Amino acid sequence: MPEQLQKLVIDNGSYTIKAGFNTGDDDGNDTSTPIKVTNAISKTKDGIIHVGNQYLSHTNNFSGIQFRRPFEQNNLTSWETEKPIWDYTLDNLLLQTNDQSQSTSSSSSSSLQKHKRGKVIDPDDIHLILTEQPYQLPQLSTNTDQIIFEEYGFNKYYRCIAPSLVPFSVDTNQINDDFVLVIDSGFNSTWIVPMIYQQIHWPAVKKLPIGGNLLNGLLREMISFRHYDISEDPILINTIKESTCFISSSNYQQDLQHKHDLMCEFVLPDFKLTITGFVKNENSMSSQKLPNDTQVLKLYDERFTVPETYFHPEIIFDNNRTTASSSLLNNAPFKNLTDLIVESIMACPSITQPLLSANICLSGGSTNIPNFKTRLIGELRKELPSNWKVNIFDKQYDINRDELSWYGGINLSNESELLQEISISKKDYFEHGANWCQQQFGFKNV
């Protein structure tokens, strides 16, 4: 008998939460789409606290905004911060009008006792699929389990790492979903996760501690030192990165020698003409009418030096006055993204190695940097055997790369029998205790 519970998928990323219900019907029609919520509590200069996306309606206060995130060192460490964000997310999921979607709930149960498509939702009617970071500390995972069952009271629950859901969202006409090497680069770090028959091969999982957050920090230091002090404008820094940065497609040193040819101008926000800033373009109408006092930022090698850290991590220390002169760091053998991918493939069973190199899938928002795929293919072909195919797939049914795990969760929720086998019910949790989830979901037992 098919499960009657509603399926809710929450991809709990350290930068944004992707959440949504499986709205598919028995005829195979699926209109499921996630909502995206900033996974942070923010404070503007006027002292007002905003939860999730609330700060977006106060664009005049973007300058000097401060973000507090529940993640530290890739681990979900603060449910005191996370829970209000979840309540806000659930309100936005379950409320229909704009006025309702802006409110935050004072308690988890009140967040869930709302209406969705005219139906009353109860936490006991929800089967939750939740993602977490790889190798999260067991006690922190246990804290999450307690929140799920004891605070919210969901009926059933499956917890997994986000990259493990990617094979469920790939285009099987392009990729052999039995052997997928997932490169998941997000806000805090980059993970290399080999999936063999939809199972994680844990001995080969690798981590590169470089992600969007580090790139933002490096860009902030370079611009503040060379041009203007933008250290208190995290939104501006992120906008500049997403608008101007790219990875050298083949030769970083050559681009460095011709950096003046790659210069671009970024118009800084004046909160009159622009709130977030934009790239100055001769064909842009806004650029032709710039006031005389407009501040324009000229960017040269900053555009490609910052994301080059994926392939030359030593750049991080070269641009720091304290560490640049350290002989220990200068002689340290830093491993880049290519090195870790090769190590991951070689740590898998030999028969699967060429299959994994031929089925590489990019996920995570940081892989959207221009030329990421092109450069990575070129670097891998230099390191892997010449008779191996190296294929990287980044377009899966026109799904955004940062949404691949969420859509994978939706597809997994359609596999009712499989989901039943790997999930834990609220009844099981209270019968066996808090450690039961860790025994079922923990990486040591997979």
Swiss-Prot record:
Keywords: Activator, Chromatin regulator, Cytoplasm, Cytoskeleton, Nucleus, Transcription, Transcription regulation. PANTHER family: ACTIN. InterPro entries: Actin, ATPase_NBD. Residues 99-118 are annotated as: Disordered. CDD domains: ASKHA_NBD_Arp6 (cd10210). The keyword Transcription regulation applies. Pfam families: Actin (PF00022). Belongs to the actin family. ARP6 subfamily. It comes from Candida albicans (strain SC5314 / ATCC MYA-2876). This is Actin-like protein ARP6. GO terms for cellular component: cytoplasm; cytoskeleton; Swr1 complex. GO terms for biological process: chromatin organization. Residues 99-112 have a biased composition (Low complexity). Component of the SWR1 complex which mediates the ATP-dependent exchange of histone H2A for the H2A variant HZT1 leading to transcriptional regulation of selected genes by chromatin remodeling. Involved in chromosome stability. Signal peptide: none annotated. Component of the SWR1 chromatin remodeling complex. One of its GO terms (molecular function) is nucleosome binding. It is found in: Cytoplasm; Cytoplasm, Cytoskeleton; Nucleus. The keyword Transferase does not apply.
